[in-house]
Swiss-Prot record:
One Gene Ontology term, aspect cellular component: chloroplast
Function: Binds to 23S rRNA.
Name of the protein: Putative large ribosomal subunit protein uL23c
Region: Coded by second part of gene, residue numbers: 47-90
Gene: rpl23
């Protein structure tokens, strides 16, 4: 489970918490099958993931990009819960 970066707390993800759906970012090079194996440890019954587009950053004349992440949404069974994931430092 080292590939899980941090939990995501946006307006949409907070609404999904009421439906027992947890949102977190993982490393972009992780595959769906690897993520599926991590999720099986939490006794979930559904997992969805997608890649987030990187944003452009400019430092003078040079154009760069921010890090790319993959976001996963885990839906748990009603009787299970997961421990809190570590938060992103700001």
């Amino acid at each position: 489970m080292d590939g899980i970066k941090y939990a995501v707390f946006t307006d949409k993800s907070i609404q999904l918490l009421g439906k027992k759906q947890y949102t977190s970012n993982v490393e972009s090079r992780s595959t769906r099958t690897e993520i599926k194996h991590w999720v099986e440890l939490w006794n979930s019954y559904e997992m969805n993931s997608h890649r987030l587009p990187g944003k452009g950053r400019r430092m003078g004349p040079i154009m760069g990009h921010t890090m790319h992440y993959r976001r996963m949404i885990i839906t748990l069974q009603s009787s299970y819960s997961i421990p809190p994931l570590r938060k992103k430092r700001t």
